[in-house]
Amino acid sequence: MKPDIHPAYRTVLFHDTAADAYFLIGSTVDTDRTQQHTDGTTYPYVALDVSSASHPMYTGQQRKTTTEGRIAGFNKRFASFGSGSNKETAATQ
């Protein structure tokens, strides 16, 4: 391996601002900001918009679409698309 080409791997404090949750994770992210954690140690700091603490997929707050509702919407939209024309032509022939 070539020397001095790899980024520094260190413990970084990530902050999910939506859920106000903090995570200590090993990372190579480059940041100039630092913040003191609850353990009293100062770590490099990165603010996040979304993490597993606030993402709807992980928190269970997502909106679920039922298949039955989608099928009913399809049938409602296309109910008159060819509903009576075949019956009328078959009866007259």
UniProtKB/Swiss-Prot annotation:
HAMAP family on file: Ribosomal_bL31_2
Pfam family, one: Ribosomal_L31
GO biological process, one term: translation
Keywords: Ribonucleoprotein, Ribosomal protein
GO MF terms, alphabetically ordered: structural constituent of ribosome
Entry superkingdom: Bacteria
Subunit record text: Part of the 50S ribosomal subunit.
Lineage: Bacteria, Pseudomonadati, Pseudomonadota, Gammaproteobacteria, Pseudomonadales
Family the entry assigns: Belongs to the bacterial ribosomal protein bL31 family. Type B subfamily.
Keyword Hydrolase recorded: no
Protein name: Large ribosomal subunit protein bL31B
InterPro entries in UniProt: Ribosomal_bL28/bL31-like_sf, Ribosomal_bL31, Ribosomal_bL31_B, Ribosomal_bL31_sf
This protein's GO CC annotations: ribonucleoprotein complex; ribosome
